[in-house]
Amino acid sequence: MLFESFDLVSALATLAACLVSMALLLAVPQQLWQLRWTATRDKSCKLPMPKGSMGFPIIGETCHWFFQGAGFHASRRQKYGNVFKTHLLGRPLIRVTGAENVRKVLMGEHSLVTVDWPQSTSTLLGPNSLANSIGDIHRKRRKIFAKVFSHEALESYLPKIQQVIQETLRVWSSNPDPINVYRESQRLSFNMAVRVLLGFRIPEEEMHCLFSTFQEFVENVFSLPIDLPFSGYRKGIRARDSLQKSIEKAIREKPLHTQGKDYTDALDVLLESAKENNTELTMQELKESTIELIFAAFATTASASTSLVMQLLRHPAVLEKLREELRSCGLLHDGCLCQGELRLDSIISLKYLDCVIKEVLRLFAPVSGGYRIATQTFELDGVQVPKGWSVMYSIRDTHDTSAVFKDVEAFDPDRFSPERSEDREGRFHYLPFGGGVRSCLGKQLATLFLKLLAVELAGGSRFELSTRTFPRMISVPVVHPTDGLRVKFFGLDSNQNQIMAKSDEMLDATV
């Protein structure tokens, strides 16, 4: 019996020793990894490094970030403050939240910081993309791109965008099954970008293949830069190469399809603007610019479109107020949108619609933030940002923590009304499109698209949630519902109006 006790104690001691050894094997490399990055502080600066954790060797905290989403940043912000360090997507970075901190980063372009995307993003978008250009090259390219989003250009795109939205909503309404709004909004954004902005005439079957390829590209834009078979990075590269091949074919065939064309598309404007600035774009530059245009329209617009549908479902009073504005402006009559094309000035004049879109983008900013790299050591919120470190300024967290917005978690479009104007306190409290010299060039186009979608939803559709509860939102790679948001859409022809009039009382979630 005594020997059996010794055997048990010995086994427990061995197990304990193994557990301690394993803990040390994990803890020691992790501690050395932490020290490795702490040692990069600027010793000539007396300020301390930001607090934070660098996670595990090589992968850092990438897995935590991927699975926790917005909760990852919120938990670390609560623990370490508005400026903290971490290690994501294969590199160290300092995450920055708060209007004043963000203002210093954005206004410090060319003096304190310059652009610096994660390696995977930079590689997949390409060296000729606007996002990757710096200095004089960036200023020149931005000037060329600016004409693509001018008032005149938007007026030209508007009828075609409205037509694509109307056709899409008709398809949704004719489907007897619920629609996955996020996935179909991606398809809508993609069709708008390819057919309207770029003017490509691609067969439907080829469009389906191109859409799937682009989805794979977007899903791997933010990935660990490890080029191995079956890695996300390798999938992204393959998707990029396939897209460039298809786009080159479409660009070369484009002059063959000009007959009967009644508007100027973004690619036409881009080429014309380049000539006006004494620049001739190479085929590689055109391919990368085209992918960048589609990318900008695809992921973020689909995210915001889905958030818009969800909030109109959640808040029927907001939708009814939107309909009332359309009625008062003569755009909605007897429950249906008046026939004819909308004008850009008419859309701009809809003030409550503008408030609704602004509030959707405040509460559900599609993009988490932007990336920079410190070109010199500087102070931020009492800590040092060492030269050479990546900096990510947070859009979403800055919105969530801003003191200028009352009841910050509530969906309240009237906060942007002329009477309240909660965003007047400072432009860096509200920045869904970034800020500074790198603010999103396409913000007016994105806003126009969302406004047109809202008008068509309010005046030309009835829709209801097909699940018992609203889904949870996740933020990687952009904000979207976990289930895509399952919604049943109904048409508004005369017969359908009678059906809906009878069923409205029974469908509390129908708007």
UniProtKB/Swiss-Prot annotation:
It is an enzyme of class 1 (oxidoreductase). One of its GO terms (cellular component) is endoplasmic reticulum membrane. PROSITE patterns: CYTOCHROME_P450 (PS00086). The keyword Lipid metabolism applies. Gene3D superfamilies: Cytochrome P450 (1.10.630.10). Keywords: Endoplasmic reticulum, Heme, Iron, Lipid metabolism, Membrane, Metal-binding, Microsome, Monooxygenase, Oxidoreductase. One of its GO terms (biological process) is cranial suture morphogenesis. It is a peripheral membrane protein. The keyword Membrane applies. It is found in: Endoplasmic reticulum membrane; Microsome membrane. Its cofactor is heme. Its main location: endoplasmic reticulum. One of its GO terms (molecular function) is iron ion binding. Heme binds at C440. Belongs to the cytochrome P450 family. A cytochrome P450 monooxygenase involved in the metabolism of retinoates (RAs), the active metabolites of vitamin A, and critical signaling molecules in animals. RAs exist as at least four different isomers: all-trans-RA (atRA), 9-cis-RA, 13-cis-RA, and 9,13-dicis-RA, where atRA is considered to be the biologically active isomer, although 9-cis-RA and 13-cis-RA also have activity. This is Cytochrome P450 26B1. It comes from Danio rerio (Zebrafish).
